[in-house]
């Protein structure tokens, strides 16, 4: 929380004005959180900033004149209503002019009047100059034309929009030829050929040849992928068969060990019986 009793220093006032220029009036919390102004305004709250901005917005002497007019209206009871109205008149508060924040992008409509759009035909000369210099048989896009004109001529900031509109208008008037290609969604413009022949347009035969080559390449790639998949599958089958053989051998070995264990168990039973009989003094004959 801020401390309203502390007198504002020049450094704090400069930080407040700089914060208003950056964030705009009323964005007190944003100004306090901004690392650029946090150190200077560490002892101030958003209410302190609001009150200080209101005091800075009121011209000097306005508040004193308003305060003096109020008691005059109460004491002079015999004056006419017209006189009271004149005494109670307050001077309107001037609206402070705040420059736009540095980070805010100024719209072209705020800088350039509509006269640029109305006077767009005067840019036809530089457009034809750019197309003649670029001399691209397939046409030039808006970006290429703009980057050619911008460093050579003085143009408004919204010239790119004016240029795009003017190119479409000239193409509609048949003063320029608009070229559309299947490789790009952008429109290309060029000066019409006086002989009437079009340059740079691929022939249907060439287009079909390129498509056929692309299809052949795709087929070859697909065949290679199929062969690789078949080889991989065969390797997996061989690996599975090897695992099956190993499992069979393990099962046979387990069966042998089971039989040996059963025979040993039977021999142990016979030996136990013989030991018991011998312990009782009986005679046993072994065949």
UniProtKB/Swiss-Prot annotation:
Annotated H15 domain residues: 119-193
All copies of domain HTH myb-type, residue ranges: 1-62
InterPro entries associated with the record: Histone_H1/H5_H15 (IPR005818), Homeodomain-like_sf (IPR009057), Myb_dom (IPR017930), SANT/Myb (IPR001005), SMH1-6 (IPR044597), WH-like_DNA-bd_sf (IPR036388), WH_DNA-bd_sf (IPR036390)
Region of interest (Disordered), ranges: 58-107
Biased amino acid composition, Pro residues: 93-103
Disulphide bridges: none
Residues of the DNA-binding region: 28-58
Cell compartment(s), UniProt: Nucleus; Chromosome
Key words, A-Z: Chromosome, Coiled coil, DNA-binding, Nucleus, Transcription, Transcription regulation
Chief localization: nucleus
Coiled-coil regions, chain positions: 233-259
BP-aspect Gene Ontology terms: nucleosome assembly
Listed GO MF terms: DNA-binding transcription factor activity; double-stranded telomeric DNA binding
Family indicated by similarity: Belongs to the histone H1/H5 family. SMH subfamily.
Primary role: Binds preferentially double-stranded telomeric repeats.
Record remark on domains: HTH myb-type domain confers double-stranded telomeric DNA-binding while the H15 domain is involved in non-specific DNA-protein interaction and multimerization.
Annotated protein name in UniProt: Telomere repeat-binding factor 5
């Amino acid at each position: 929380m801020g401390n309203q009793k502390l007198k504002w220093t020049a450094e704090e006032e400069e930080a407040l004005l700089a914060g208003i220029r950056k964030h705009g009036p009323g964005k007190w919390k944003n100004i306090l959180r901004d690392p650029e102004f946090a150190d200077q305004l560490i002892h101030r709250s958003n209410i302190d900033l609001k009150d200080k901005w209101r005091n800075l917005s009121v011209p000097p002497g306005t508040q004193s004149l308003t305060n003096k007019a109020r008691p005059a209206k109460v004491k002079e009871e015999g004056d006419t209503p017209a006189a009271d109205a004149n005494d109670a008149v307050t001077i309107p508060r001037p609206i402070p002019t705040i420059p736009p924040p540095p980070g805010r992008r100024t719209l072209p409509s705020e800088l350039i009047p509509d006269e640029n759009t109305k006077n767009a035909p005067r840019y036809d000369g530089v457009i034809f100059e750019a197309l003649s210099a670029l001399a691209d048989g397939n046409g030039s896009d808006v970006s290429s034309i703009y980057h050619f004109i911008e460093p050579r001529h003085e143009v408004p900031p919204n010239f790119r929009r004016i240029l795009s509109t003017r190119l479409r208008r000239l193409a509609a008037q048949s003063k320029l030829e608009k070229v559309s290609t299947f490789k790009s969604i952008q429109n290309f413009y060029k000066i019409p050929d006086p002989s009437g022949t079009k340059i740079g347009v691929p022939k249907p035969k060439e287009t079909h040849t390129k498509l056929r080559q692309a299809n052949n390449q795709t087929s070859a790639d697909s065949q290679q992928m199929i062969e690789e998949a078949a080889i991989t599958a065969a390797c997996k089958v061989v690996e599975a068969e090897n695992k099956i053989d190993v499992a069979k051998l393990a099962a046979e070995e387990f069966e042998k060990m089971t039989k040996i264990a059963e025979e040993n168990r039977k021999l142990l039973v016979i030996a136990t019986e013989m030991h018991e009989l011998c312990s009782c003094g009986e005679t046993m004959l072994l065949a």
